[in-house]
UniProtKB/Swiss-Prot annotation:
Entry protein name: Cytochrome b
Membrane topology: Multi-pass membrane protein
InterPro entries: Cyt_b/b6_C, Cyt_b/b6_C_sf, Cyt_b/b6_N, Cytb/b6-like_sf, Cytochrome_b, Cytochrome_b_C_euk/bac, Cytochrome_b_N_euk/bac, Di-haem_cyt_TM
Species, as recorded: Chauliodus sloani
This protein's record includes keyword Metal-binding: yes
Other comments on record: Heme 1 (or BL or b562) is low-potential and absorbs at about 562 nm, and heme 2 (or BH or b566) is high-potential and absorbs at about 566 nm.
SUPFAM superfamilies: a domain/subunit of cytochrome bc1 complex (Ubiquinol-cytochrome c reductase), Transmembrane di-heme cytochromes
Cofactor(s) needed by this chain: heme b
Function of the molecule: Component of the ubiquinol-cytochrome c reductase complex (complex III or cytochrome b-c1 complex) that is part of the mitochondrial respiratory chain. The b-c1 complex mediates electron transfer from ubiquinol to cytochrome c. Contributes to the generation of a proton gradient across the mitochondrial membrane that is then used for ATP synthesis.
Binding-site residues, a ubiquinone: H201
Location in or out of the cell: Mitochondrion inner membrane
Spans traversing the lipid bilayer: 33-53, 77-98, 113-133, 178-198, 226-246, 288-308, 320-340, 347-367
Length: 378
């Protein structure tokens, strides 16, 4: 008689995804980040749910309700620190996951890749509306600056901004709806994650060699389930250490000041994980141009599968592409640094150069390197 996990309508799905899934034998630790992102999402939903039980989405009480959570709620400080730093770890895992996909050519699974990019955009939206909720100075001014970007939309811009604000400025209506969105979006992310997995399991995982691995697969459990558990332990250790020892290291000190529409902070900047895109936005002097560059800095990922010219899949045996990949990594780090700097003398031109290099690598250098390497193979 067949096991229940193979016959039960629900357990059968879980079995095919987590137990009997054929996985390539040679996938490295770079393939751990998908499951780590699942762990981050679960952790964020659980901690977020407990925070939502005590948070009030009203401008007169939002800031003090967060203070109340940290002071008066049992382990409230811990839940809040886990949630705030959990977002940072979420994005660290996302960037490593995307980097792995770019390096090893996983983007050639087009449906999986494109849903991944949509997931990335959804996660960015979720993090943005979440950052507004504590109603500190940076929350308020960040919301004002970023929502204002929509005014660059021709003809409908002004109406669009006021529609999102629910008035003529960022006010109570804005905070209330942002809380509603922040509660809803993680579940949309969860649904999109299931689609991401569904499409991945249609093809199976890629591997470091970039070759077909049908002849050499092992069951996901116990091999990769235990490998993932090790990753879970490392991530949770790092996250709890951060939440306990350096909870405010990645935050902005300005957010400890309650929101004041009459006082603008000296440097308005988003959380560290958005700085690279913020730098690209600022490097273009035209408002609409900047907004388009900001959008395209993420959407350019959708073009990567279309611009793949090489006969080989991954970068494992392609030295030129490897060089460009690491140049891209360095470039994103430079953009992240520039995004946190004031708009003045050396930083402006560095940001513009780094933005130009960012798009050039994606749109020109990588496809050209692929063609060159094809020639070298002949």
């Amino acid at each position: 008689m067949a096991s229940l996990r193979k016959t039960h309508p629900l357990l059968k799905i879980a079995n095919h995804a987590l137990v009997d899934l054929p996985a390539p034998l040679n996938i490295s630790a770079w393939w751990n980040f998908g499951s780590l992102l699942g762990l981050c999402l679960a952790s964020q939903i659980v901690t977020g749910l407990f925070l939502a039980m005590h948070y009030t989405s009203d401008i007169s009480t939002a800031f003090s309700s967060v203070t109340h959570i940290c002071r008066d709620v049992n382990y409230g400080w811990m839940i809040r620190n886990m949630h705030a730093n959990g977002a940072s770890f979420f994005f660290i895992c996302i960037y490593l996951h995307i980097g792995r996909g770019l390096y090893y050519g996983s983007y050639l699974y087009k449906e999986t890749w494109n849903i991944g990019v949509i997931l990335f955009l959804l996660t960015m939206m979720t993090a943005f509306v979440g950052y507004v909720l504590p109603w500190g100075q940076m929350s308020f001014w960040g919301a004002t600056v970023i929502t204002n970007l929509l005014s660059a939309v021709p003809y409908a811009g002004e109406a669009l901004v006021q529609w999102i604000w629910g008035g003529f400025s960022v006010d109570n209506a804005t905070l209330t709806r942002f809380f509603a969105f922040h509660f809803l979006l993680p579940f949309v992310v969860l649904a999109a994650t299931l689609l991401h997995l569904l499409f991945l399991h249609e093809t199976g995982s890629n591997n470091p060699a970039g070759l077909n691995s049908d002849a050499d697969k092992v069951p996901f459990h116990p091999y990769f389930s235990y490998k993932d558990l090790l990753g879970f332990a490392i991530l949770l250790l790092a996250l709890t250490s951060f939440a306990l020892f350096a909870p405010n290291l990645l935050g902005d000190p300005d957010n400890f000041i309650p929101a004041n529409p009459l006082v603008t902070p000296p440097h308005i900047k988003p959380e560290w994980y958005f700085l690279f895109a913020y730098a690209i936005l600022r490097s273009i002097p035209n408002k609409l141009g900047g907004v388009l560059a900001l959008l395209f800095s993420i959407l350019v990922l959708m073009l990567v599968p279309l611009l793949h010219t090489s006969k080989m899949r991954g970068s494992t045996y392609r030295p030129l592409t490897q060089l460009l990949f690491w140049a891209l990594v360095a470039d994103v780090l430079i953009l992240t640094w520039i995004g946190g700097m004031p708009v003045e003398a050396p930083y402006i031109v560095i940001g513009q150069l780094a933005s130009l290099i960012y798009f050039s690598i994606f749109l020109a250098f990588l496809p050209l390197a692929g063609l060159l390497e094809n020639q070298a193979l002949k």
